[in-house]
Amino acid sequence: MNYLEFEVIWGVNNIYSILELKSKLIYEGIFKGKVLETGCKEYSPLVPGDIVLGYIYGSRKVYIDKRASRKNILWRYNRKADLRQTIVSNIDNILIVNSANFPEMKNFFIDRVLVVAEEQNIVPIIVINKIDKGISQRVEEFSEIYKNLGYKVLKTSVKTFEGIKEIKEVLRNSRTSFIGQSGVGKSSLINLIDSKASQSVNEISHKYSRGKHTTVYAISFYSESGIIVDTPGIKEFGIETLPFENLRYYFKEFENFASLCKYKSCLHVSEPCCSVISSLGNGISKLRYESYLKILSELKNYKNYAR
């Protein structure tokens, strides 16, 4: 059987739009059987960025038989299914898009995404969008905290074009996913970066103080700058299936202090002679530490619930 390689562009209800890698032609792909055998229970067996093997059986139609191994995944916890839900795969960068003012920038959301990025070896870039409407002192403080940790922080506006050139530099010759809560302006940024991207943009719903979901499914497309993956606006980004003992490794500022803790198994909560705790406010941000404790509590509660 003559297998061909395809890249998943997007899909819904187990019907996928896939790109044949050699011809660059788009096909409609479906599973040969009822499900795709991946060796584990998954909420999303195929997502944008996946490479699959299949064969053509009709006019622009393909039976998908296998999924190639993934370099990495951007995932979150799906509470309803009680599983990890993969959003995109095989990406180089993730742009975590936030609003400078409305909807309110939330460091807890950013920190959860950063944990997954660190776990999966994805380069995270924090974007503060809509700066033409002003930036609060609180947002500026968040920005400095992440900059001091070595994370790239870009300030952008689709009205003044500030930061757009820098985003295009990030995108160049790479695969980059945009993620953010509803209403932060992801689709507006993508439309400005690539005018051919037919992304709909809705006004923020003031009634609920959140944005309307304008991108319903994750979708990737090739732009002049690089490969872009847009994702739906996300209200919550849970990471409950991450083992709580591992969380400490993904707060990068702990690394230089953890080796000085009395106990190797130190979780930096209430243990005696904890170098991380003693460094709060002097090398360790109190805001980031509060975020760590909150996430750690969630992971512990999930483990107890799952027993």
Swiss-Prot record:
Cofactor note: Binds 1 zinc ion per subunit.
Localization: Cytoplasm
Cofactor section: Zn(2+)
This protein's record includes keyword Translocase: no
Cited function: One of several proteins that assist in the late maturation steps of the functional core of the 30S ribosomal subunit. Helps release RbfA from mature subunits. May play a role in the assembly of ribosomal proteins into the subunit. Circularly permuted GTPase that catalyzes slow GTP hydrolysis, GTPase activity is stimulated by the 30S ribosomal subunit.
Self-association state and partner proteins as the record states: Monomer. Associates with 30S ribosomal subunit, binds 16S rRNA.
GO molecular function: GTP binding; GTPase activity; metal ion binding; rRNA binding
One GO BP: ribosomal small subunit biogenesis
The protein, known as: Small ribosomal subunit biogenesis GTPase RsgA
Organism: Borreliella afzelii (strain PKo)
Family affiliation: Belongs to the TRAFAC class YlqF/YawG GTPase family. RsgA subfamily.
Domain CP-type G: 80-237
PROSITE patterns listed in its UniProt record: ENGC_GTPASE, G_CP
Binding site for Zn(2+): 261, 266, 268, 274
Binding residues annotated for GTP, in chain numbering: 129-132, 180-188
Primary gene name: rsgA
Record-linked CDD domains: YjeQ_EngC
Key words of the record: Cytoplasm, GTP-binding, Hydrolase, Metal-binding, Nucleotide-binding, Ribosome biogenesis, RNA-binding, rRNA-binding, Zinc
Entry GO terms, CC: cytoplasm
